[in-house]
């Protein structure tokens, strides 16, 4: 009995170790694919003059986030992180590059608006509105990508389902933004962990949070 218990504990700890390794690999690949953006965001001040170059360097974020989500979703059955990441990245670029251009354009427009309105006290309402729209866009994007990974649909169908879930399962859907921000704030206290696990850990936590929503949709599909 004690031997079985020991083996179970060893298996349990090994699975944790596997996830640490997988998250590290996925995070390094994510940083590699977004290296120009990561470098620029650290060396450039965010101001109107730098927004175009930040925009151009950030269009890789959405396809690479898709690749991380897709890779982590099937990691227990397909643990070859590097191979799977690049397969899914190629698919992500085919499906999402044009959409990424649009999403990132609106994101940086909002950032620019926030920069301008922050300096004009008479436009404080617009300042907070742009912050709100920015939060909505980021939350919608991560949820959209998780939905896309879980069901084969067109871009339009994926967007519609994501919007419906944001209404029906609003708490879970909106919680993902807090998870993203909270993860980076906590890991920022330990920069080495932020570098090693930041993006992949935040994405994994968003996927875990969204799992009940996925189960809900799957039940609806089975009952239909």
Report each predicted region and the residues it spans:
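Small-residue-enriched core segments of transmembrane alpha-helices in multipass membrane transport
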Residues: 130-135
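Helix-coil boundary and N-terminal low-complexity module in membrane systems
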Residues: 1-112, 122-128, 139-142, 147-224
């Amino acid at each position: 009995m004690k031997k079985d218990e020991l083996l179970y504990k060893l298996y349990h700890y090994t699975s944790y170790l596997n996830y640490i390794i997988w998250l590290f690999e996925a995070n390094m690949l994510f940083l590699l694919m977004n290296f120009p953006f990561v470098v620029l965001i650290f060396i450039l001040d965010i101001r109107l003059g730098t927004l175009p170059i930040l925009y151009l360097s950030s269009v890789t974020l959405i396809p690479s986030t898709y690749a991380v989500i897709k890779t982590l979703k099937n990691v227990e059955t397909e643990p070859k992180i590097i191979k799977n990441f690049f397969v899914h990245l190629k698919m992500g670029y085919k499906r999402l590059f044009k959409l990424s251009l649009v999403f990132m354009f609106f994101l940086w427009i909002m950032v620019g608006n926030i920069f301008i309105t922050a300096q004009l006290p008479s436009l404080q309402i617009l300042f907070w509105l742009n912050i709100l729209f920015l939060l909505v866009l980021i939350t919608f994007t991560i949820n959209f990508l998780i939905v896309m990974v879980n069901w084969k649909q067109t871009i339009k169908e994926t967007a519609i389902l994501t919007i419906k879930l944001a209404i029906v399962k609003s708490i879970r859907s909106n919680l993902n933004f807090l998870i993203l921000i909270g993860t980076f704030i906590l890991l920022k206290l330990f920069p080495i962990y932020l570098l090693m696990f930041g993006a992949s850990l935040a994405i994994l936590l968003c996927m875990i949070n969204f799992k009940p929503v996925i189960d809900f949709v799957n039940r609806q599909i089975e009952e239909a």
